[in-house]
Amino acid sequence: MKDEVDEITIFYKYRAKIKLFGSKFVENNKHLCTIEFDGKQLNLQEYIILSNEQISRLYHSIITIKLKGISKITNIEHMFSNCRNLLNVTNIDNWNTNKIINMNSLFRECESLKCLPHKLDWNTSKVTDMSYMFFRCISLSSLPNISNWETKNVTNMSYMFDDCKLIQSLPDISNWNTENVINMKSLFFGCEKLLSLPDISNWDLRNATNIGLMFDNCWSIKYLPDISKWNIEKVTNINCLFFDCSSLLSLPNISKWNVSNCKDMSEVFKYCNTLSYLPDISKWNVSNPSNLEEMFYSCSSLLSLPDISKWDMSKVNKINGMFSSCKSLTSLPDISKWNISNVSNIENLFDSCSSLLSLPDISKWDMSKVNKINGMFSSCKSLTSLPDISKWNISNVSNIENLFDSCSSLLSLPDISKWDMSKVNKINGM
């Protein structure tokens, strides 16, 4: 039986700088596929022997590629990966993808690609990996209609739409079956012009373990879908989840999320600088996270924080910059009873909280494992006094530079004359 022929028409920005396929795709499929360049055949085994320069020289005017035997292929990962001068790909809308398992990095870093077919009517029922599929397609202004893709077997969607900087709307992926997806890290990261997301409120995240950076740098989105009912009980990483969602006016009510297995909550709300309030996350179980650094960093419009005074901090080792640059806060929750006995880094904790009128009584914090307190109270310009921190054990601290820098309203300092400074090697700007 004659091999099936799939013809792809491609256009390049610079004819002299042709890179046809990603090396991983070639390596995976060299025995299954023959490429025909305008009637000149070259099997994939020969392709990987030839240098890019040789191919450019031999086929500098190529506009059409025919792939013979595409229906046999199970892996198209990196197929067009790093084809940085590729402008257009056509005739792929009805590809026979019945056997394909892996679509990882299919169009990854096709930075000049401006056009894909309106709809990709592909059978994706066997695909398990869609990660990095459109990663850094920075010239694409729209994506194909992929709303009907079968995603039941997909386990990895990480970085799928990452850095699609010009996309203003996504296909309606609200009905995608995500019950087996494990990794959604950076799924929509860097979609800077995206104005809204499809209604992904009913996505099933029961098996997801990583949703970190998922909405990171979605600068233009004002409201997110109601993701309050997502089951994230297996998730271990939510770091930078809403990082730099700098146009968000409110967040869904995520107060009842089960975050008990999360290990990393760093920078979750960082640079959400238009939010004036957060959901009531006071009952979040943070007994497992080791990292809460910069969690609320530069939430500069926040008028108050949820009452996080009862959070179990016993396993946390990083809270540096946690409240830094929350410039509108005039007070903080009573965090005086936090158990920070395992914390090693609290640098810049209250840095640039320029409207704070007072601090909780943190005089009894166990500082025995802390090695950095630099910049902790820096630029707290409205404080007239500090808690009595004279009895803090800072015997393991090496860096206290800029500790009280620019605390311009302070009338006096606690008596820190008896601090054990034997390990300190940085005190400039204290």
Where do the model's predicted regions map?
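N-terminal capping/linker segments that flank leucine-rich repeat
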Residues: 1-98, 120-123, 149, 174-176, ...
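Extracellular beta-strand/beta-solenoid scaffold signature
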Residues: 117-119, 144, 171-172, 198-201, ...
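Canonical position 11/12 of the leucine-rich repeat
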Residues: 84-88, 111-114, 138-142, 165-169, ...
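Feature marks extracellular polysaccharide-active and adherence modules
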Residues: 68, 82, 108-109, 135-136, ...
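Short acidic, glycine-rich loop/turn motifs
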Residues: 36-39, 56, 107, 242, ...
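Short, solvent-exposed linear patches
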Residues: 68-77, 94-105, 121-132, 148-159, ...
